[in-house]
Amino acid sequence: MRALQFLLRVSPAFLLLVLCLQLEINKAEESIWKVIQMDLQMPTVAVANEEVTVKLGIQTELKECMVIKAYLRSNIQIDGPFNYRYTSCLCDDYPRTFYWDLVANRTATIAAVVDIIRELDICPEDRAVVPIKSNRYYVLHRLNVS
């Protein structure tokens, strides 16, 4: 009988504990990590045939590392370092920053593109993941040339 009385007295506290744990589990399940966060920095206005520096910062909230390839695209032909492609390992504790110098002679829309790829000898011990949903991310920026 005493055991039953003890169980009935503990029951409301136990139910409250279970409710709190359930709320925390649901909160953790709703956490969505951003696979890629991109910060594209470049001027919006440039003088024709003047060199412009493009800076692309990339980071992730995933706990696993990824092999990324970063490059620029444009709606007009731009030669030189603009066409360089960077391949690197991106981890949550090691964000990456890439730079390009370009010379434009007319207004252009610049796209900074990051592909998550499968490539060996980039990440330590070749431990890297490729997301199932999407493996290409981009951000657009307009460069007005006067």
Swiss-Prot record:
Keywords: Disulfide bond, Glycoprotein, Secreted, Signal. One of its GO terms (biological process) is detection of chemical stimulus involved in sensory perception of bitter taste. GO terms for cellular component: extracellular space; nucleus. Disulfide bonds join C65-C91, C89-C123. InterPro entries: Ig-like_fold, Ig_E-set, PIP. One of its GO terms (molecular function) is identical protein binding. It is found in: Secreted. Its main location: secreted. Glycans are attached at N105. It comes from the Eukaryota. Residues 1-28 form the signal peptide. Belongs to the PIP family. Monomer. Interacts with AZGP1. This is Prolactin-inducible protein homolog.
